[in-house]
Amino acid sequence: MQYEWRKAELIGQLLNLGVTPGGVLLVHSSFRSVRPLEDGPLGLIEALRAALGPGGTLVMPSWSGLDDEPFDPATSPVTPDLGVVSDTFWRLPNVKRSAHPFAFAAAGPQAEQIISDPLPLPPHSPASPVARVHELDGQVLLLGVGHDANTTLHLAELMAKVPYGVPRHCTILQDGKLVRVDYLENDHCCERFALADRWLKEKSLQKEGPVGHAFARLIRSRDIVATALGQLGRDPLIFLHPPEGGMRRMRCRSPVDWLSS
């Protein structure tokens, strides 16, 4: 039977990893990798908030993934692939949540500034919660997940003006009516986001260590973006899969593939 980590131990691990008290922390997590621990997902959230302290702001992804249904920040559950920690977080008292389908949730002094922008299109554009974390010089914690879950790399793609996109849509309520909104998203399988692991480690920009039973990575958002922009400046298609018949392919989460020559 695996050891059950106590919250006090998790707080120590987070601080040893380099979480900044009073800072902004964007967390992508897999509770399955972290567990078992005292008080389950809630215990992990409490440990994260304790490590940040009262002056810190905790941020998590909180979108529903339901393209054909309007988003309600008070009731819409998160898409299952974001995990139980994210789905627990937005339901807690004093947690603020974006009022659009590409929502993030946040708690702390900077929460309103991070989540209050209107619908960002594409979702991780320079007017998105991910971008606000970047502007506030926040950190990104990948807790039991890899860079394929790192939404800050999508921000870097858009800042680099990558020449690819996938047709997407979402549904909003406008004057009491359902309205479909179409847009292009820099969405793909994200497998090659794993390249960022080596880039950041080579520059000693990525801190690594255990949190609970999980392997954790901690990086400044600005370091992620600056490093990715440097690589995308040399090869705008570096996050796409290698050429197949002279073309670079986006392996997408949907049946749609968009090809870039």
UniProtKB/Swiss-Prot annotation:
Alphabetically, the GO molecular function entries are:
aminoglycoside 3-N-acetyltransferase activity
User: What reaction gets catalysed by this protein?
Assistant: a 2-deoxystreptamine antibiotic + acetyl-CoA = an N(3)-acetyl-2-deoxystreptamine antibiotic + CoA + H(+)
Specify whether Chaperone is a keyword of the entry. Answer: no
**Residue stretches spanning the membrane:** none
GO BP, one example? Answer: response to antibiotic
Pfam families reported for this sequence: Antibiotic_NAT
| Coiled coil, from the record | none
Domain of life of the native organism: Bacteria
Keyword check for Transport, yes or no. Answer: no
What are the UniProt keywords, alphabetically? Acyltransferase, Antibiotic resistance, Plasmid, Transferase
What InterPro entries does the record point to? Answer: Amioglycoside_AcTrfase, Antibiotic_NAT-like
Which SUPFAM superfamilies does this entry report, sorted A to Z?
Answer: TTHA0583/YokD-like (SSF110710)
EC number(s) of the enzyme?
2.3.1.81
State the protein's purpose: Resistance to antibiotics containing the 2-deoxy-streptamine ring including gentamicin, kanamycin, tobramycin, neomycin and apramycin.
Which family does the entry's similarity section mention? Answer: Belongs to the antibiotic N-acetyltransferase family.
Q: What is this protein called?
A: Aminoglycoside N(3)-acetyltransferase IV
Organism expressing this protein natively = Salmonella sp
| Classification lineage | Bacteria, Pseudomonadati, Pseudomonadota, Gammaproteobacteria, Enterobacterales
Q: Which gene encodes it?
A: aacC4
